[in-house]
């Protein structure tokens, strides 16, 4: 019989190994937490990662059978960047179908009225901050979780491409700044850098980047850059601004010792994909976000 219980310290070794096994093939899950860090995250003792915007509230459930931990899930409530209020299953990892179903039932039983998301299309809501570099979509490399969600009535509503660039094979090329455009660079309080394109005193484009050193003490995390956002306002697109900003961001990352850069982009973001591919990025994984109701 499977019982749903709060996480306890004795669950941590089993759940940590279960998590590592589940995400082992997911490229953007490469920088996984060690057992001590994972335990602090599951038990709510971990210091927040400034790079990520944590949920407002969260509950973690463990599926236990015969004293053994068979999986865990998290239910979170958060306000998204657009002001929308959401509730979502932000983690779901399990050893067998029965444990997965019990965990989904526990999350649904604790959720409020309205639509429930699973692995939502946002950053920073998983209790395991390192999961997918903070992106909460469910990696295609974890198909048994997708299968459990769909069998429980969830449907995918967004797909994301996970991309990676080898900066040694494709070093960035400096590009001239278009006439009439000024570039500014400024760090924010989350450890990221914003490069902005200014025209006539107005911001018309920006690119946000950092290394992944905040997410992991692994030396390779400090050598891996991440693009958190790239945008150009309507009316200034197709003028090469995005390419100029990306080239500048990649130059800065190389200057910080990076030899790789990662990003995610919505699968139907057709205008941006030629830019990323031309710079040398390749698709290494995909992820999906789900909803029910």
Spell out what each predicted region is.
Residues 111-137, 253-264:
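Conserved GNAT acetyl-CoA-binding A-motif
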Residues 96-111, 232, 238-255, 273-278:
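Conserved acetyl-CoA-binding loop-helix of GNAT-fold acetyltransferases
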Residues 124-156, 243, 267-285:
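Conserved active-site alpha-helix within GNAT-family acetyltransferase domains
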Residues 22-23, 27, 31-111, 120-124, ...:
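Conserved donor-binding loop and adjoining core beta-sheet/short helix segment
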Residues 90-95, 228, 233, 237, ...:
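Residue-level recognition of the GNAT/N-acetyltransferase active site
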Residues 156-238:
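Flexible, substrate/cofactor-facing loop regions flanked by secondary structure
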Residues 3-17, 23-28, 183-191:
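A short beta-loop-alpha structural element at the N-terminal edge
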Residues 142-145, 152-155, 161-177, 259, ...:
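C-terminal "cap" of GNAT-fold acetyltransferases
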